[in-house]
């Protein structure tokens, strides 16, 4: 059997995922922001959100920058920069929901301006900060998105509007990211 006929190929080929974000999430963001968007920042896993929303936003205003957040241990950033699928970039990481060791067909690398890699530790720390300082119990990939936002801040001008999409809830991470013992076991500092 070919990989495209195997059941495991479902994950790689979620093309309706991207289309759903093009038809719903992208227009919703555009409308809520009144079209005043300069940057869109989001974690990248299957690629559906960044590709669908990114395509919609670029069609509205091709000057909008699309920033993908990636994990160390994932291949997206290097592939985007070089076109090379480098197996040496692939190694285990903890952040769930972003990064890949495959190239999902959903990821439209042409509309993504830049990938920013975030460490597992920073993703966890920023998820915890969101809960502590903003009252948002967000997931691990959301922490990565916020950590990436902070790493990218020198790319944003003072009066520009930056939209960051937070994908998941922190309820799945109560025993991990939000657990001090888990953080210590990983060697992560407590914030």
Locate the predicted segments by residue.
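Single conserved hydrophobic/aromatic residue that forms the stacking wall/gate
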Residues: 1-7, 11
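A glycine-rich, Thr/Ser-enriched phosphate-binding loop motif common to dinucleotide/cofactor-binding enzymes
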Residues: 13-28, 139-144
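Glycine-rich ThDP/TPP pyrophosphate-binding loop and its adjacent helix/strand module
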Residues: 20-65
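Terminal helix/beta-alpha structural elements that buttress the NAD(P)+-binding lobe
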Residues: 39, 136-140, 144-146, 150-152, ...
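Short glycine/serine/threonine-rich phosphate/pyrophosphate-binding segments
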Residues: 44-54, 76, 141-149
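Active-site/ligand-binding loops adjacent to catalytic centers
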Residues: 59-140, 177-191
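Phosphate-binding loop/pocket of nucleotide- and phosphate-handling active sites
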Residues: 147-191
């Amino acid at each position: 059997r070919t990989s495209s006929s195997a059941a495991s190929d479902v994950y790689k080929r979620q093309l309706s995922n991207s289309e759903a974000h093009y038809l719903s999430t992208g227009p919703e963001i555009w409308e809520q922001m009144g079209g005043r968007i300069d940057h869109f920042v989001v974690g990248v896993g299957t690629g559906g959100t960044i590709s669908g929303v990114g395509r919609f936003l670029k069609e509205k205003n091709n000057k909008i920058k699309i920033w993908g957040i990636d994990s160390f241990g994932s291949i997206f950033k290097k592939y985007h920069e070089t076109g090379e699928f480098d197996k040496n970039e692939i190694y285990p990481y903890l952040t769930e929901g972003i990064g890949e060791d495959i190239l999902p067909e959903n990821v439209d690398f042409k509309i993504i301006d830049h990938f920013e890699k975030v460490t597992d530790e920073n993703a966890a720390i920023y998820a915890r900060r969101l809960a502590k300082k903003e009252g948002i119990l967000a997931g691990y990939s959301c922490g990565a998105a916020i950590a990436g936002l902070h790493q990218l801040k020198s790319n944003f001008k003072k009066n520009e509007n930056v939209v960051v999409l937070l994908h998941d809830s922190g309820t799945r991470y109560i025993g991990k990211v939000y657990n001090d013992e888990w953080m210590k076991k990983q060697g992560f500092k407590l914030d």
